[in-house]
């Protein structure tokens, strides 16, 4: 048999079938760096409209985990898609560098006491730099393009100085408060914590009911209308923090709740109890009392001013009114310790009650505290409960499990503790109202983010921005020793401090002799040594980065972070921006869910479900990780597992194989010379170009709307359905067997060229390494990188009429039914391949109209050796109906010989003596002028 291989146009390309991403991606990365790709893009986009995605700074501690990898990948997809849309979209990465975690690591390594404060801060700075280098390598290895040589660091001298300037503007605008307020306090940190540093965990706590005895029982009884009685009156409170009882200054009741006087017997003694009417039954059940009488009914405001004896201190405390009292649990009477609770503090402030804080910075009672002096607060619960029991004031005690605030770093329970702190006042100068108004102007993605952050801002207390730590940006203020007032020239003095910090770091403030700035006035002022909350550091990036860097702008077009940042960076950025310039720092905010395993569990070493991005990159490649990130619905929790990553790897392989098919059939195609005019294109090729063009519109819209899973699905379907199992399958015959430079083949190549030009750009924001690798093998003159181009726009006008489009949709369905039938025949051993079959289609008028025009070329669409069409009502006995209404099929095994070149079974095989093993079509294609195709 003659070998006709040399007469065929078999696919050829150097683009590798095997991706080998772990080895190949670093080579691409090196090429980008040699090319200075990021700078080239900036130069290329100069003067174009800006699009700014502002990078929320990750903490400079530890390697990138899957959450940060997901974060940076989504950001990179956005930035690259905007670049392809023609925007100048610079990406300036940043790092959050101050704060406790770095202090703890340095302390563990070097010891805090062995170093001077300045040496300790330098050690923290060095440690942060080392962590940044690790993370920078991780992010670059993921293919994230950005200004990695010039990131912003919150510990850069310039940034530290600008943070002081931001604070100076906030001071000048009247938003700073100094107050002695209860704040979340971590004894292990020895410092206040911000709301965003608090996490809630289950904790076992003692829940106790404690009786406060009325000083004038007779007067109380009379208020309730009970006369001629001598029984004592108790006001029971319910609390899960018995350790706060030494700081009790009052008992709060709700002014509008109804309270009852309940007569009962407790501890073998008659007693009257004042309880919220709605809680009487549950309280008495708790006390194990079945027999009791309810006397009288008063609203809470009638109890105001009643005096009670503290259960174990020589202290008389009043009943006061508080809107925070509820009937959800307890007794309706709330133990009020202003030093240890924010609501307690606010209600006590109205009554001008003393605020005594008996707890030190390490969470221990000060030495002279009655009974529990020197003890850690949580250990003080037991002796207090024992004392209450011995004195007859303990009405009930049990242990409960409840959600309780913990330190995000130490995982230890927090306390509320009153200390002198600096606050941004939420109600000062209308900050809260303006924040709520600005939230409504921002686009929140998903939309529920607006309500979430709105509620948080509406409910939040003043923002405590001061911390008692070494490693941080100082609050460079001077306080008058007698009046406690800020120095009248504070903003101007802060600018001078900023100039010093710019040159010498934050040490300049801590080392500063006040006389340098204040002269003789220095003796009257005290220098503040607190540092700023790290959420303030990162919250002013809009001022220190967006406003300062020439290539950026404020407001940013988008902030993109995890949904936990509604209470973190989104909020701190919003509040500082409003306090500085009276508008939000962002136009839109996109949030995503936590990365969890396939069962919805958080990643943890103890569960053994931790997947490190470095391992994924090492084993599968960064592009597989990026494809996984794009495929996930980020509006909910994001699942990951080895199985999920394997699915992403399989999808990647399909995309790569599609690209390889395109490239391998364009090896001899020069777009300048070989492109076929649209009016000469084979109809199927025109359909393919039109389909590609339509899909591109959808893909670009999806990129603009940040609908990454929809893009993934569209590309996946394009590779597997429209292209893989339909168009590319059909045109193989034409590509391989038609005359090399004949119109049928060049028409198909023209379509493949347009598809490849569009396709490589679609995938570029997601699988960036692979897209740029494909780009190097594309035909024609081009830029050195796909990222120096825009979405492909040089499509011919291949628009189809609605009728034509409908016809091709029907053809897809018809071919699907034929394929199913042929597969059955194959499985039954009746045929080896589809080319061994001859198909008769019995079609109704609707379907007939779609396929009749194809005539002889229908067999190429169905990839059978013969295909004919007859009316549906002429079905033979051998025909069978399909799932497509109006279509029946009859399949016969061809009796003709197989062509040695195209493998079709045709009656013309053997008819031409010189080429007895070829069909007439192959003789024409191989040795004569070649066939013509009109439709397929």
From Swiss-Prot:
Cofactor note: Binds 1 zinc ion per subunit.
Chief localisation class: cytoplasm
InterPro entries: aa-tRNA-synth_Ia (IPR002300), Anticodon_Ile_BEm (IPR033708), Ile-tRNA-ligase (IPR002301), Ile-tRNA-ligase_type1 (IPR023585), Ile-tRNA_ligase (IPR050081), M/V/L/I-tRNA-synth_anticd-bd (IPR013155), Rossmann-like_a/b/a_fold (IPR014729), tRNAsynth_Ia_anticodon-bd (IPR009080)
Reaction catalysed by this enzyme: tRNA(Ile) + L-isoleucine + ATP = L-isoleucyl-tRNA(Ile) + AMP + diphosphate
SS bond list: none
Transmembrane segments: none
Molecular function GO terms recorded: aminoacyl-tRNA deacylase activity; ATP binding; isoleucine-tRNA ligase activity; tRNA binding; zinc ion binding
Motif ('HIGH' region): 58-68
Cofactor: Zn(2+)
Cellular component aspect of the GO annotation: cytosol
Alphabetized UniProt keyword annotations: Aminoacyl-tRNA synthetase, ATP-binding, Cytoplasm, Ligase, Metal-binding, Nucleotide-binding, Protein biosynthesis, Zinc
Binding annotation for L-isoleucyl-5'-AMP: 561
Gene Ontology biological process terms, A to Z: isoleucyl-tRNA aminoacylation
Subcellular location: Cytoplasm
Signal peptide extent: none
Gene3D superfamilies: 1.10.730.20, HUPs, Valyl/Leucyl/Isoleucyl-tRNA synthetase, editing domain
Main enzyme class: ligase
Annotated binding of Zn(2+), by residue: 899, 902, 919, 922
EC number assigned by the record: 6.1.1.5
Keyword Protein biosynthesis attributed: yes
Domain writeup: IleRS has two distinct active sites: one for aminoacylation and one for editing. The misactivated valine is translocated from the active site to the editing site, which sterically excludes the correctly activated isoleucine. The single editing site contains two valyl binding pockets, one specific for each substrate (Val-AMP or Val-tRNA(Ile)).
Its job: Catalyzes the attachment of isoleucine to tRNA(Ile). As IleRS can inadvertently accommodate and process structurally similar amino acids such as valine, to avoid such errors it has two additional distinct tRNA(Ile)-dependent editing activities. One activity is designated as 'pretransfer' editing and involves the hydrolysis of activated Val-AMP. The other activity is designated 'posttransfer' editing and involves deacylation of mischarged Val-tRNA(Ile).
Subunit structure: Monomer.
Record family assignment: Belongs to the class-I aminoacyl-tRNA synthetase family. IleS type 1 subfamily.
Designated name of the protein: Isoleucine--tRNA ligase
